[in-house]
């Protein structure tokens, strides 16, 4: 594995992989508008908001992505419990896409992951993937803090087989906790074994063309060092609720 030189990682490179997130139930449209403005100014790659906040309307170019690129819009499905029927998750995801979402972060049935029931996970995730085919980006939240190593590896394999674009650690809402370096490292190791691990800094088009899968670490990433820890462990996206603080802006 290539040595990771933290000193060479730029603020711009990290900003480009940030999903600036606002999923609090009390968030208003004004709060979301402020999030979009800040994310745009910081050069973040995406914002992640609740489905009820869609559509967002006109979204300005994001500085880190070039003058012709716009901030990507992500939302959630089956959130935060994952205890929705598969068809409900799929319908929620498809409707969000119709309202302008570019990316869907869907929560798995964690009970199936705990049971290492790969068939159940596959059935659910394939249903959602079919509802939001490429070029829509599908990120699968596995709630990694609840899973032991083999359960986590099983979930990662199911995500890959179902055609997910990213495996995501956490909702950030479960009391078990959010992302950890250990969990991200396990996820990266499993993707590496499958020949599917996307490297840090790879563009979306290049990742899709190569058939690789990224890792989104989310939950508890509050500063620059924590962000670099996750990237070093294998994360290629970071979900954060305080992007300016993470970037030291």
UniProtKB/Swiss-Prot annotation:
The active site is at 105 (proton donor/acceptor), 168 (schiff-base intermediate with acetaldehyde), 216 (proton donor/acceptor). Keywords: Cytoplasm, Lyase, Schiff base. InterPro entries: Aldolase_TIM, DeoC, DeoC/FbaB/LacD_aldolase, DeoC_typeI. It catalyses: 2-deoxy-D-ribose 5-phosphate = D-glyceraldehyde 3-phosphate + acetaldehyde. One of its GO terms (cellular component) is cytoplasm. One of its GO terms (biological process) is deoxyribonucleotide catabolic process. Its EC number is 4.1.2.4. Pathway: Carbohydrate degradation; 2-deoxy-D-ribose 1-phosphate degradation; D-glyceraldehyde 3-phosphate and acetaldehyde from 2-deoxy-alpha-D-ribose 1-phosphate: step 2/2. It is found in: Cytoplasm. Pfam families: DeoC. GO terms for molecular function: deoxyribose-phosphate aldolase activity. PANTHER family: DEOXYRIBOSE-PHOSPHATE ALDOLASE (PTHR10889:SF1). Catalyzes a reversible aldol reaction between acetaldehyde and D-glyceraldehyde 3-phosphate to generate 2-deoxy-D-ribose 5-phosphate. Belongs to the DeoC/FbaB aldolase family. DeoC type 1 subfamily. This is Deoxyribose-phosphate aldolase. It comes from Corynebacterium jeikeium (strain K411). The lineage of its organism: Bacteria, Bacillati, Actinomycetota, Actinomycetes, Mycobacteriales.
């Amino acid at each position: 594995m290539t040595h990771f030189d933290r000193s060479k990682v730029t603020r711009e490179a990290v900003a480009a992989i940030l999903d600036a997130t606002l999923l609090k139930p009390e968030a208003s449209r004004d709060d979301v508008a402020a999030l979009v403005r800040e994310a745009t100014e910081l050069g973040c790659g995406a914002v992640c908001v609740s489905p009820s906040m869609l559509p967002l309307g006109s979204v300005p170019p994001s500085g880190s992505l070039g003058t012709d690129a716009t901030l990507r819009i992500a939302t959630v499905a089956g959130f935060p419990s994952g205890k929705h029927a598969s068809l409900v998750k799929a319908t929620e995801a498809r409707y969000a896409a119709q309202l302008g979402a570019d990316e869907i972060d869907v929560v798995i049935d964690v009970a199936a992951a705990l049971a290492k029931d790969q068939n159940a996970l596959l059935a659910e995730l394939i249903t959602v993937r079919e509802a939001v085919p490429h070029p829509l980006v599908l990120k699968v939240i596995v709630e990694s803090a609840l899973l032991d190593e083999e359960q986590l590896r099983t979930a990662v394999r199911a995500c890959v087989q179902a055609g997910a674009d990213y495996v995501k650690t956490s909702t950030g809402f479960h009391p078990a906790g959010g992302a950890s370096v250990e969990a991200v490292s396990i996820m990266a190791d499993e993707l590496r074994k499958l020949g599917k691990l996307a490297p840090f800094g790879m563009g979306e088009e290049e990742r899709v063309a190569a058939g690789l899968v990224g890792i989104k670490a989310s939950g508890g990433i509050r500063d620059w060092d924590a962000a670099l820890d996750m990237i070093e462990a294998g994360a290629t996206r970071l979900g954060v609720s305080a992007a300016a603080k993470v970037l030291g802006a």
